[in-house]
Design a protein with these regions (language model features):
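Helix-loop segments that flank and shape redox-cofactor active sites
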Residues: 39
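Non-catalytic cell-wall polysaccharide-engagement segments
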Residues: 2-21, 28-36, 44, 48-154
């Protein structure tokens, strides 16, 4: 995905997340592959290259009971119902970025109690990754997002 297209999408679909933060998260989560699928505790032999392949893979994972995340923001299937997502909509770049914004904002609001903005953001990134404020730090996710943010700023 071209940088200008992503910037437009981020500003339109996730306006409450700084574009640099959105870009860093998407860099780490999906590498800008709108059809990316991450399998929790597993891995795909290769990433889908089309919407049809992605939907077939999602259906197979769901039928087998796997926990997985999809799209630009790698939204986890456990969040689909509460965010009003379907496998089809979660693959839409704008919908994925909007869902990313919702999850990240929820995490940030929970993390912000008495913290500096940067501490709260790092805690929110950990929460985005894992649902809590520590796992994303321990597993290096927060560091990868921070690094992606710094690299993209150059």
């Amino acid at each position: 995905m071209e940088a200008a297209i992503f910037l437009t999408l981020a500003m339109t679909c996730a306006p409450q997340v700084h574009p640099d933060t959105a870009r860093a998260i998407v860099t780490v989560e999906s590498g800008f592959n709108r059809y990316a699928i991450g399998v929790v505790g597993g891995a795909l032999e290769r990433q889908p290259r089309s919407r049809g392949e992605a939907l077939a893979t999602i259906n197979a994972l769901a039928a087998a009971g796997w926990n997985y995340s999809v799209g630009l923001g790698q939204i986890n299937v456990a969040n689909f119902a509460r965010l009003g997502l379907t496998p089809e909509s979660a693959l839409d770049p704008c919908v994925s970025l909007a869902a990313m914004q919702t999850v990240l904002r929820e995490c940030y609001e929970r993390a912000n109690g008495g913290s500096t903005q940067q501490v709260a953001l790092r805690r929110a990134l950990s929460c985005y990754y894992s649902g809590n404020f520590t796992t994303g730090m321990r597993h290096g996710y927060v560091g990868r997002v921070v690094t992606a943010s710094r690299l993209g700023a150059n």
